[in-house]
Amino acid sequence: MTTFYTVVSWLIILGYWLLIAGVTLRILMKRRAVPSAMAWLLVIYILPLVGIVAYLSVGELHLGKRRAERARAMWPSTAKWLNDLKACKHIFAEENSAVASALFQLCERRQGIAGVKGNQLQLLTSSDDVMQALIRDIQLARHNIEMVFYIWQPGGMADQVAESLMAAARRGVHCRLMLDSAGSVAFFRSPWAGMMRNAGIEVVEALKVNLMRVFLRRMDLRQHRKMIMIDNYIAYTGSMNMVDPRYFKQDAGVGQWVDLMARMEGPVATAMGIVYSCDWEIETGKRLLPPPPDANIMPFEQASGHTIHTIASGPGFPEDLIHQALLTSVYAAREYLIMTTPYFVPSDDLLHAICTAAQRGVDVSIILPRKNDSLLVGWASRAFFSELLAAGVKIYQFEGGLLHTKSVLVDGELSLVGTVNLDMRSLWLNFEITLVIDDAGFGADLAEVQDDYISRSRLLDARLWVKRPFWQRVVERLFYFFSPLL
């Protein structure tokens, strides 16, 4: 019996070390950033069992077998649709401004289509303005309404949007709503999901959280897009979830969320429609291609029409494109660069690009919320401040609530707005969307919004920053080391 227990003990020890060695080899063989690999290895060696379970759960990008098969199956029809769209040469821009040219060329080569021109854009900077405009557009909708949100939180004006959407469905408008399972958990636990389905709305719970499948699909891969398409001609996107800030996370101690949305009319709605089509097919298996190009996507004749490229990220979309777009934008800056984000945990490449821009004389400003709803990200963000300040970057801490706007403005002409945070999850993992706009008029509008943010912010003083307590520096460096995992 003693021999039996001895053999079993040695087999357990051998299996334990083989498991650690196997996961180590798996990490080393995966193409990933070195800091991320080192962080994972450290976690596994310090807490082997916890680290291995965590890595197998959230360390690799698993879309799930069924969704991955759908993503592969949809591309032939999607490619044909894109080729048909290319035949509508009148909607595509033939040239761009000097500051935007490299980025638009990158997007065209990687996504297969050029930026679309002749769009009309309107920046909406308050939740009331967004929801009032949306309710009006829903009431006028005639054919179809598609929406996707990370969070839909019942309460306040969000309920008025829901009521108008149900009324549209009852009068025959085809309405589809896709919401992230984790972000919209309060919605799916409320009566609203059933009420909408009873009204005729197709409601889909995207990337459903299921702990029984934790090793088969990455549970923290989330549908983070915020998009609305109406009649294939009107579109919205930006940072705002379908929430009324007066009713959302009031106990978080960060104030009301501050967001920005863009309302668009023109052919960009068609480009966004194909993104929604791909998301819908990956999640449901149902093909929902936008209608073929026709006169409805004729561009505006006014010279003020905006040129826009839509960048989508996530499994099934061009890998690393949003990260490349941000790098290209930063390196294109010659005069000034303004960035707003609620969560700032940049890649090494992006951090160095921002610092280099400041060191070569570009006026670089980053606007962040002073109080953050994520303790981990808040501390990790602070770990980058010293390097940024030393390079000459101005860091503004917004004091008017949780600044949730994601925007980049380069030299007053190239703008990026959408759902992408400057952190690892948005850059490498989630389903995201960003609009790239080449237009000085829109740039002036965005600059006005950013100036308002700055007026409600406190400029971080580099001299005071270096005097912060030692314990804060220790906590910052700890979270900095694990920032590749956040």
UniProtKB/Swiss-Prot annotation:
Keyword tags: Cell inner membrane, Cell membrane, Lipid biosynthesis, Lipid metabolism, Membrane, Phospholipid biosynthesis, Phospholipid metabolism, Repeat, Transferase, Transmembrane, Transmembrane helix
CDD domains on file: PLDc_EcCLS_like_1, PLDc_EcCLS_like_2
Subcellular location: Cell inner membrane
Pfam families attached to this UniProt entry: PLDc_2 (PF13091), PLDc_N (PF13396)
Top EC class of this enzyme: transferase
Active site: 224, 226, 231, 404, 406, 411
Ranges for domain PLD phosphodiesterase: 219-246, 399-426
GO molecular function, one term: cardiolipin synthase activity
Reactions this protein catalyses: 2 a 1,2-diacyl-sn-glycero-3-phospho-(1'-sn-glycerol) = a cardiolipin + glycerol
Membrane topology (UniProt): Multi-pass membrane protein
Biological process terms in GO annotation: cardiolipin biosynthetic process
Entry GO CC: plasma membrane
Family: Belongs to the phospholipase D family. Cardiolipin synthase subfamily. ClsA sub-subfamily.
Reported function: Catalyzes the reversible phosphatidyl group transfer from one phosphatidylglycerol molecule to another to form cardiolipin (CL) (diphosphatidylglycerol) and glycerol.
Protein name (record): Cardiolipin synthase A
Originating organism: Cronobacter sakazakii (strain ATCC BAA-894) (Enterobacter sakazakii)
